[in-house]
């Protein structure tokens, strides 16, 4: 018999986990009768029903006997939005897992766990719609909501046979936030609500003074910080001062008398900090706590987190009110957090942490560094066995890896929360592949399970040679989020953001992170903390972003004021270089070399499923043979954009030849300079054709304005350098620069306008393309060249350039004795071209939308100057996204849709794609698939992301 606590009342209950399977199976026959004759569902630190075995039947898997939940009837989703409070308790729920938008992720999953018979503390969930009404009502509870909350509270009190504020049979509550999308640590939680001087005395009489006053001082601290806005540090100072006076290091070493005295000191903090006393009325406490959770939805840290993670369209947060269970009732109690599989690697093994004699926030907040879950198996074997069983049940029910919070009170297990677990890219891919192999999910579900950001993480670098830095390892913490990070040390979130804005790589070093640090955590290359476990705030947030993190590094001492941290006698100061290995927890002095990651077998398997599912082809933007090889290795199906101008910067000889061409006055001078460039271009094209053997290569003719090839600096410096490069006199240079100067070069002398004005420029580039194509074909390479004319705004421009291209092609084929098939098309990047796409399509064999310039010209935003006002537009909600990163579907997107439809109407064989960086942005890819484009083209490193995004559109 284990002693359990029912809100101030110690109870005894049998441990059903010890019952023989035959007894449990017989009890299932009583299910219907018991459902009509329910006993109180004692929860969260309260005992289960004596016959709780009825909620399970045995499932034999090989030699292992595992329990399986029997699904009790679940209430269908509520169709009216008028209901704002939903109750739940073991075997009964007014909600379910499909109601996340209304109940939040936490509330929906609590309802679901209760419905399938797991031991969940009874409670109630206030809907996200109520939060929205609260915000619209001037941050006041909307009419009638408080009465609905009290009605829900009556249900909980009846289930518990306890009352809020009754010292003899007190009901204590937790009040937690829970949005539809998980936002770890961003919103607020209050535990042990309902305590005051009278209630704590009653609690002490029944459950022990130390436990009672430990709960009280925790509540005073948390309520003061979350609800009253009192800095946590003011309470922490009192705690640390008392521990110093007593000569102890751990909170658990404080006596009952110490904790009672500490509670009095905490109450004084209210008066000192706020000028008002701690509110003793439990219902007033509850009302204030609900308000605080609703307020936390609109807090700066929550807003920043949603902005960083592009979370939009949510109504607000739900509020979950549950009766408390206690992990701080001694050495037979504890609390923990676990994942049903390793979230970093995906390994099928429980991954979590456990703290004996502690409450849940101690683990999540990183206040104490917890121990491995194995500790629980050793000291609480029965509770651990049931926990393992519950993990199996939940994975089979949700068909996903789950993140679970639990408490053990006097050897009794209570499930406090479950949600889909956040995972790294590596973990996501392995979990998806393993679950397909296990028969839990199909490949289409697996494709939806891996986010495009997960693949982005897998493309991040690792250390080039881990063995080379071993002598520089100065400390080892917990490997909280894998990958490698190299940067300069900073000690505040603000500094991390500042350094990032300056183009510097920063490592954020903190004693422990808090939700206020999210901006700096996002800006930093990596995160190092002295405290906190694998499920601390820093670890969870970093893993969600694929950010390298080492947590709980007990060897370091952080001094924020001095901007240094120490490891023994070694001092590391702000600006020093540091490297982190988030996969091993190693902290390494200096700037270590990084190397790109290699694709794993799991990733190759997963990407093959994505490729089978998608319709849209994925090409790459690549300008060099190395870029082309990288693109092919990442799964590109061709080159959608090869920018010839980038080749000109590859060497001093090339750029000097380009400058001679620009400075040329006569066609003869210009041709002489171009003849110098031709072998360079031909060599580069040969390398690209070789790398893309058998795949199409789309080469764009010269596009940028000529000034981009001139030296930087003041006019005198430019003239001196051009004089040296070209051999012309200064007067000639000055005269030529004056003639070439433009007020707005991005709308001036560039693109096809260059090729029309200087046909010899187009001739040189096309000659280099076809000479390279024939040469490679003669070497056994299958070459599929496509030539793209940029910045076309009229069909006449395209017709002119096609004439030049076909003339040169005929000459080269005649000279080299071989004819190859090729295509000629154009970029659609001027709004006028989109409007008359039907006319242009009569000349072109393919369209490629240049969404960078099309966005620039449609909005009238200069890409070079948009940084001056775009942050203001985004912060004020004038724009929801940077249109150069996320396609403007209502404006630019409609031009693309119209041009595609008109172009294909005029030329049914027209191939249509997109080659701006939008080609690698998932929501943009979904749009391109929807309007029927044939392909997208993006940077080589974003090719896997585009492949997955294209697959997710159709599954």
From Swiss-Prot:
Residues that bind Mg(2+): 829, 853
Top EC class of this enzyme: transferase
This protein's record includes keyword Transcription: no
Catalysed reaction, written as an equation: pyruvate + phosphate + ATP = phosphoenolpyruvate + AMP + diphosphate + H(+)
Post-translational modification Phosphothreonine, affected residues: 535
Subunit structure: Homotetramer.
Gene3D superfamilies: 1.20.80.30, ATP-grasp fold, A domain, ATP-grasp fold, B domain, Phosphoenolpyruvate-binding domains, Phosphohistidine domain, Pyruvate Phosphate Dikinase, domain 2
Keyword Disulfide bond in annotation: no
Function statement: Formation of phosphoenolpyruvate, which is the primary acceptor of CO(2) in C4 and some Crassulacean acid metabolism plants.
Name recorded for this polypeptide: Pyruvate, phosphate dikinase, chloroplastic
Gene Ontology annotations for the cellular component aspect, listed alphabetically: chloroplast
Active site residues according to the UniProt entry: 537, 915
Additional observations: The reaction takes place in three steps, mediated by a phosphocarrier histidine residue located on the surface of the central domain. The two first partial reactions are catalyzed at an active site located on the N-terminal domain, and the third partial reaction is catalyzed at an active site located on the C-terminal domain. For catalytic turnover, the central domain swivels from the concave surface of the N-terminal domain to that of the C-terminal domain. A short cytoplasmic isoform may be produced by alternative promoter usage.
Organism field: Flaveria brownii
Transit peptide feature range: 1-71
Record-linked SUPFAM superfamilies: Glutathione synthetase ATP-binding domain-like, Phosphoenolpyruvate/pyruvate domain, Phosphohistidine domain
Top-level taxon in the UniProt lineage: Eukaryota
Record EC number: 2.7.9.1
